[in-house]
């Protein structure tokens, strides 16, 4: 269904956004073909191009339009898409900036930025999908680029192992998506999601089982409980920098699709996934010492919280996913910065594996990481507190008091493994470490971490403006 649009400028900006992203990809491929040695310049080109794409995405956020469809109703752009598109572009830019600096342990690779650009196309298109055919094509676009990205350092045995495991488990989820799509088409003869929703509403036929299969496949893709075991292994085996990327971007894109199309899915399955995710992710890391495993379970826990915001279709979803995504990226950038001080790395691709390796003489960097962990715990006035607060308020206003109490209880339990990491970091503030290399942090990386910390610490100051903007977008 095509709805009227108030201005032609909005359409022009959005079409330009997509053309610019495709032009960036083509330009980047040509540049790589003729310049394969200076990888830092290649990565800087990607950052500059995506910065302009981010500017176009910002300009496309308007409050004076309703939704419209593109490419024969295959994609639907709504006000709810705009913040997610901008967030995904910012996440990719932030992680790409790290590749513009010289690192001690991670070897520069010319294919990483290219795979990220391809993946970004799938990431920003998936929440806009309005048809079963592009749904499968787009999710495979982002999935295959993630498989390749995971195994891009093919000299690492663990990286290759992670890529194969990711490919096999992702293939199982893809089969479930195809099965769901085939059953829906057999029952209705339709592939357009808007038309399918209207058909079910008018006919009164209760055949949502096919979409339940689709939901299970998407939960599988995100690595939420009870289909989470593969994700812990993949994130643990993958190189540290790759883990920082693959553990957040796909989840944001897929969860946003579920949030924007919640009317298609069973709330009972979402509630079940919520309870299992928070229970598993709050309890299991209490016995973990692997820093990537702990952060992987932390991701399951936080996206479990997000499932409740999806259930209530509340604007708290945007507040929580924005603050968690920025906190997640900041934590990994801090850990990557700490690797520059590591004298005895666990491996070349993942210098830091266990919590006791978080030894750093840079007290400012140590404090930044502690602040991020406090935010995950939910200490006010950090953004993690406001994210949980608005989710709990939304649950209670919808009569879901048990779910609100569950979030509070498991947040308290999860505090213990965050405190375990904080204890290790706090010891750096008082002890003189001799098993580290006293080298200054890269100025570019330090600047990015500083900017992110300012955004997180001052989150409460611009939160009212953010809430007003989200309210206007959905009014």
Swiss-Prot record:
Membrane-related topology note: Multi-pass membrane protein
Subcellular location: Mitochondrion inner membrane
Record GO biological process: mitochondrial electron transport, NADH to ubiquinone
Chain segments annotated as transmembrane: 45-65, 82-102, 112-132, 133-153, 162-182, 198-220, 240-260, 262-282, 291-311, 318-338, 365-385, 402-422, 447-467
Keywords: Electron transport, Membrane, Mitochondrion, Mitochondrion inner membrane, NAD, Respiratory chain, Translocase, Transmembrane, Transmembrane helix, Transport, Ubiquinone
Primary location: mitochondrion
Enzyme Commission numbers on file: 7.1.1.2
Reactions that this protein is recorded to catalyse: a ubiquinone + NADH + 5 H(+)(in) = a ubiquinol + NAD(+) + 4 H(+)(out)
GO molecular function, one term: NADH dehydrogenase (ubiquinone) activity
Pfam families in the record: Proton_antipo_M
Any one of the GO CC terms: respiratory chain complex I
Protein family (similarity comment): Belongs to the complex I subunit 2 family.
Functional note: Core subunit of the mitochondrial membrane respiratory chain NADH dehydrogenase (Complex I) that is believed to belong to the minimal assembly required for catalysis. Complex I functions in the transfer of electrons from NADH to the respiratory chain. The immediate electron acceptor for the enzyme is believed to be ubiquinone.
Descriptive protein name: NADH-ubiquinone oxidoreductase chain 2
Gene name tied to this protein: NAD2
């Amino acid at each position: 269904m095509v709805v009227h649009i108030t201005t032609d400028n909005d359409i022009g900006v959005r079409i330009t956004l997509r053309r610019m992203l495709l032009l960036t990809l083509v330009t980047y491929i040509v540049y790589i073909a003729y310049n394969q040695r200076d990888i830092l310049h290649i990565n800087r080109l990607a950052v500059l191009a995506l910065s302009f794409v981010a500017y176009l995405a910002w300009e496309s956020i308007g409050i004076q339009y309703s939704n419209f469809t593109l490419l024969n109703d295959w994609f639907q752009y709504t006000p709810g898409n705009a913040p997610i598109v901008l967030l995904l572009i910012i996440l990719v830019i932030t992680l790409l900036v790290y590749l513009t600096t010289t690192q001690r342990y991670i070897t520069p690779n010319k294919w990483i930025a290219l795979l990220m650009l391809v993946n970004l196309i799938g990431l920003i298109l998936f929440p806009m999908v309005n048809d079963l055919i592009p749904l499968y094509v787009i999710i495979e676009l982002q999935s295959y680029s993630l498989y390749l990205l995971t195994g891009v350092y093919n000299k690492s045995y663990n990286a290759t192992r992670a890529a194969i495991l990711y490919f096999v488990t992702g293939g199982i989820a893809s089969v479930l998506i195809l099965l769901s799509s085939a059953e829906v088409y057999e029952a209705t003869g339709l592939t357009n999601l808007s038309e399918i929703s209207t058909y079910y509403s008018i006919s009164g036929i209760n055949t949502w089982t096919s979409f339940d299969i689709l939901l299970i496949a998407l939960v599988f893709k995100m690595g939420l409980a009870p289909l989470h075991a593969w994700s812990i292994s993949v994130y643990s085996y993958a190189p540290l920098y790759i883990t920082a990327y693959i553990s957040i971007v796909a989840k944001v894109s897929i969860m946003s699709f579920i949030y924007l199309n919640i009317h298609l899915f069973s709330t009972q399955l979402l509630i079940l996934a919520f309870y299992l995710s928070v229970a598993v992710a709050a309890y299991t890391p209490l016995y973990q010492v692997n820093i990537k495993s702990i952060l992987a379970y932390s991701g399951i826990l936080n996206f479990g919280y997000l499932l409740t915001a999806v259930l209530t279709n509340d604007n708290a979803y945007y507040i929580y996913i924005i603050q968690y995504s920025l906190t997640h990226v900041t934590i990994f950038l801090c850990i990557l910065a700490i690797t520059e001080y590591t004298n005895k790395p666990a491996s070349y691709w993942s210098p830091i594996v266990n919590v006791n390796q978080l030894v750093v003489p840079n007290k400012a960097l140590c404090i930044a990481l502690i602040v991020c962990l406090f935010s995950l715990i939910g200490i006010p006035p950090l953004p993690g507190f406001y994210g949980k607060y608005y989710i709990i308020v939304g649950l209670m206003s919808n009569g879901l008091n048990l779910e609100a109490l569950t979030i509070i209880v498991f947040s308290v339990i999860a505090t213990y493994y965050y405190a375990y990491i904080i204890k290790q970091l706090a010891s750096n503030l008082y002890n003189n470490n001799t098993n580290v290399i006293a080298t200054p942090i890269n100025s570019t990386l330090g600047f990015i971490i500083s900017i992110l910390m300012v955004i997180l610490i001052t989150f409460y100051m611009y939160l009212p403006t953010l809430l007003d903007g989200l309210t206007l977008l959905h009014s």
